[in-house]
Amino acid sequence: MALLKFNNIGIKAIAATVPHRVIKTTSLTDYYSSEEIEKFVAATGVEERRFAAPDVCASDLCYQAACQIFDETDIRREDIDALFFISQSPDYKIPGTSGILQNKLGLSKETIVYDINMSCSGFIHGLLMAYNFLQQPSCLLYTSEPTRL
């Protein structure tokens, strides 16, 4: 396993927002047998999940969490240099959700924004990218959109 070490970088604040609707895993008997549900809960420990309403996007949850940070800490919108949005459920295919959040939060147009399409490991991957962004004096970026008929 690679060992990554970052100096002089830290996390100043963490906020979380979760949807209000709770679905118990044991209530999914219309989709899975009781035996399958028991095995799933035993293997994962997931006894319930939170589900957003149909009109709630991933950016809505991020916006609420970001507002908590701005309202409850000394971190100011104008201090934000980069915004990383990580999800496997972006608001739209295009434009990127990070740009939507940048605008909705009133961040500077100079703020660098990134969308990272990942699931479970996305948070760690995003931390790695943010730390690298803060430590490296230069960066190389490739992008490609192979348009096909």
Name each model-derived stretch.
Residues I37-D60, Q88-L140:
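Conserved catalytic cysteine-centered active-site region
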Residues G10, F84, D115:
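Conserved beta-strand segments that form the floor/walls of ligand-binding pockets within enzyme
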Residues Q68-E72, M129-F133, T143:
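A generic secondary-structure signal
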Residues Y142-L149:
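Conserved small/polar residues in nucleotide/adenosyl-binding loops
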Residues M1-D81, N103-L105:
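Conserved "HGTGT" condensation-loop signature of ketosynthase/thiolase-family condensing enzymes
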Residues A82-Q88:
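Short glycine-rich or small-residue beta-strand-to-loop segments that form or flank ligand, phosphate
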